[in-house]
């Protein structure tokens, strides 16, 4: 029996006791809710940016009373690979911390260098060191000279607290789980909701987790793509806004709203990853990362005192060589005066990615029978206008 349970955990399969099936869940656009004016990419995902890959490892095991160090387990890891061989072909990058009650390791080097040279990993708070170890082991396997005749590395690992549903003291995400997520990362459609690092997350008093979206600019504006991936674990129910409608205040009666906060819930956190194929440098990507915070605000967040809101942006348009052979190397650079369409696209895609995390998440029962209810899609759509916004040109 123990062997079978262990196999289920390693396989990352969701048990029926812990989460409802995804059947019937829909992305917000499939509910008829159109966010913003720009069109999404073919997948409406961060993987619409060429070369970007995403992988998950979902861990769920046990139910009932919390046994610290044993379970129940409702957690996982999500990885974003900016491009193949990112160690030798680094990507320009920038970051922004909206509120720092949390951690994203490796940001000091990103800020200093202006580039990113390894995959990004998302997980729960107490699992950060083990996940960092997994990223390092995977990188050393790919590049055996790391730390010997080559540089060392400081992985980028971002956390949100899933302890309201998960046995966080158990630190159940292993080195092998991280390596499996990296090995399985793909450039296709991205699983959303109760998956990977989002397995135990709660957002706006509903089940949250992983969400993604993208925007494709017109050829006149450069034809660039912006993709967003979030791990949503933030906000209180009365704050939730969907496409300008105060859904959180309308969803429940005042008494129900007072009970919507899950026992042990903290102020929460959100991690936002921005990817683009527009030729931006680290300074411009930091500016883009700041604008993602506006998309977060459009869903109702005010970045509360205890919230950890971290944003990392990178561009795949240029290659920063590992060891340049010459003193200089070429980089294409978009003029700042042409940033506005990318700014608008980033805000829109961030807003939609957060909403996708909510509408794709499934109800989860976690430790001590704490229950995170998925937002009711019928109730949600009943609160929204039947007519979508007019399709107008945001840059006439």
Question: How would you label these PLM feature ranges?
Answer:
Residues 1-4, 350:
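Generic alpha-helix initiation/capping and coil-helix boundary signal
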Residues 3-13:
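Bacterial N-terminal signal peptides
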Residues 13-21:
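Signal peptide processing junction and immediate N-terminal pro/mature segment
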Residues 20-396:
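Alpha/propeptide regions of enzymes that mature by internal proteolysis
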């Amino acid at each position: 029996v123990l062997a079978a349970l262990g196999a289920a955990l390693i396989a990352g399969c969701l048990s029926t006791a812990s989460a409802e099936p995804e059947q019937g869940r829909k992305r917000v656009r499939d509910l008829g809710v159109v966010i913003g004016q720009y069109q999404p990419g073919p997948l409406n995902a961060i993987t619409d940016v060429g070369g970007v890959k995403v992988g998950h490892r979902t861990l769920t095991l046990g139910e009932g009373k919390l046994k610290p160090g044993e379970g129940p387990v409702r957690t996982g890891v999500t990885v974003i690979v900016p491009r193949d061989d990112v160690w030798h072909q680094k990507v320009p990058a920038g970051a922004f911390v909206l509120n720092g009650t949390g951690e994203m390791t490796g940001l000091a080097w990103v800020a200093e260098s202006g580039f990113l040279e390894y995959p990004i990993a998302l997980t729960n708070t107490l699992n950060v060191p083990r996940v960092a170890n997994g990223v390092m082991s995977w990188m050393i396997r790919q590049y055996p000279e790391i730390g010997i005749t080559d540089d060392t590395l400081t992985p980028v690992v971002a956390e949100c607290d899933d302890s309201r549903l998960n046995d966080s003291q158990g630190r159940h995400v292993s080195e092998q789980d991280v390596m499996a997520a990296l090995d399985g990362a793909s450039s296709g459609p991205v699983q959303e909701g109760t998956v990977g690092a989002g397995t135990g997350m709660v957002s706006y008093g509903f089940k949250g987790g992983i969400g993604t979206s993208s925007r494709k600019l017109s050829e006149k504006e450069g034809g660039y793509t912006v993709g967003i991936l979030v791990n949503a674990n933030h906000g209180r129910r009365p704050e939730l806004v969907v496409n300008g409608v105060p859904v959180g205040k309308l969803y429940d009666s005042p008494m129900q709203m007072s009970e919507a906060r899950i026992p042990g819930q903290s102020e929460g956190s959100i991690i936002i990853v921005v990817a683009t194929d527009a030729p931006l440098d680290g300074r411009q990507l930091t500016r883009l990362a700041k604008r993602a915070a506006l998309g977060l605000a459009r869903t109702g967040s005010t970045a509360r005192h205890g919230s950890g809101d971290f944003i990392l942006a990178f561009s795949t348009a240029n290659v920063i060589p590992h060891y340049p052979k010459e003193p200089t190397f070429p980089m294409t650079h978009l003029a700042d005066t042409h940033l506005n369409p990318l700014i608008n696209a980033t805000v829109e895609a961030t807003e939609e990615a957060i909403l996708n995390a909510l509408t794709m998440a499934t109800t989860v029962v976690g430790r001590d029978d704490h229950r995170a209810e998925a937002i009711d899609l019928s109730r949600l759509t009943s609160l929204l206008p039947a007519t979508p916004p007019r399709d107008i040109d945001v840059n006439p």
